[in-house]
């Protein structure tokens, strides 16, 4: 009986160890935004015609593939929203391919806004370099989580949730954004709905927002799709 008791305890310990290892494995995949790397480097071949989930590796690479000055200077904010996003993702820094990280810089004129949007492939953390911002995100239970953030402060936007930043100050503001994806993707809510190509049907938007089709057409005129040649 004693031997049976010892064997039973050993079995239980092994069972717990296996469950623990499984939990770690599951946890790793739950929190990873991108697939893990399988080699030291895989510099993206941005011109390859091969279609994969990500980018294929190019054979020859240099230090230039791992560096960029893209976010070193303020961007122009003279647009309808008074803000501009400058990215440093795999499309600007090919060496980021398979590494699961990227950055962006966002500049805001006084009164400027980065309209409600989502990043379907990444969570985002912003660090305020200059000015102050009113920021927030909305949960799937329609709860608004918001606050004013100041120079030197960070704020996190969970993956996939609608969020925004607004500069209500009298001076320009700027942040650096960090993402846990080499290419987080962005869907701006107003542009997605009212500037899609082909366009979202007027009756769909009218019924969704409880407005008439004339109002829909007026809003669409402000978000006309950019023609690509």
Curated annotation (Swiss-Prot):
Catalytic activity annotation: 2 superoxide + 2 H(+) = H2O2 + O2
Presence of the UniProt keyword Oxidoreductase in the record: yes
Coiled-coil spans in chain: none
Extent of the signal sequence: 1-32
EC number of the protein: 1.15.1.1
Cupin type-1 domain boundaries: 69-217
List of residues binding Mn(2+): 117, 119, 124, 163
Expression sites (tissue/organ): Nectary tissues and to a lower level ovary. Not detected in petals, stems, leaves, roots or other floral tissues.
Keywords, ordered alphabetically: Apoplast, Disulfide bond, Glycoprotein, Manganese, Metal-binding, Oxidoreductase, Secreted, Signal
Example GO molecular function: superoxide dismutase activity
Xref: InterPro entries: Cupin_1, Germin, Germin_Mn-BS, RmlC-like_jellyroll, RmlC_Cupin_sf
Pfam family, one: Cupin_1
Domain of life of the source: Eukaryota
Swiss-Prot/TrEMBL cofactor(s): Mn(2+)
Glycan-carrying positions: 60
Disulfide-bonded cysteines: 42-57
GO cellular component: apoplast
Subcellular location: Secreted, Extracellular space, Apoplast
UniProt remark on cofactor binding: Binds 1 Mn(2+) ion per monomer.
Family per record: Belongs to the germin family.
Protein task: May interact with bacterial adhesins thereby protecting the reproductive tissues from microbial attack. Has no oxalate oxidase activity.
Subunit note: Monomer. In the absence of manganese, it forms tetrameric and pentameric forms which show superoxide dismutase activity.
PANTHER family (UniProt xref): GERMIN-LIKE PROTEIN SUBFAMILY 3 MEMBER 3
Protein name: Nectarin-1
Organism, as annotated: Nicotiana langsdorffii x Nicotiana sanderae (Ornamental tobacco)
Gene of this entry: NECI
């Amino acid at each position: 009986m004693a031997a049976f008791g010892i064997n039973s305890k050993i079995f239980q310990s092994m069972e717990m160890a296996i469950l623990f290892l499984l939990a770690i494995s599951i946890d790793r995949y739950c929190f990873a935004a991108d697939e893990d790397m399988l080699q030291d480097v895989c510099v993206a071949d941005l011109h390859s015609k091969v279609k994969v989930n990500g980018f294929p590796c190019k054979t020859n690479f240099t230090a230039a593939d791992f560096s960029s000055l893209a976010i070193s200077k303020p961007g122009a904010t003279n647009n309808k929203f008074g803000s501009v996003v400058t990215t440093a993702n795999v499309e600007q820094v090919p060496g980021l391919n398979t590494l699961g990280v990227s950055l962006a810089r966002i500049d805001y004129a006084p009164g400027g806004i980065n309209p409600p949007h989502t990043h379907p492939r990444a969570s985002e953390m912003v660090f305020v370099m200059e000015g102050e911002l009113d920021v927030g995100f909305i949960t799937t239970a329609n709860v608004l989580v918001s606050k004013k953030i100041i120079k030197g402060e960070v704020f996190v936007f969970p993956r996939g949730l609608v969020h925004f930043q607004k500069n209500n100050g009298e001076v320009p503001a700027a942040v650096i954004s960090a993402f846990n994806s080499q290419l987080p993707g962005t869907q701006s809510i107003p542009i997605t709905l009212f500037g899609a190509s082909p366009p979202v049907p007027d009756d769909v938007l009218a019924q969704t927002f409880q407005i008439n089709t004339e109002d829909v057409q007026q809003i669409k005129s402000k978000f006309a799709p950019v023609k690509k040649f």
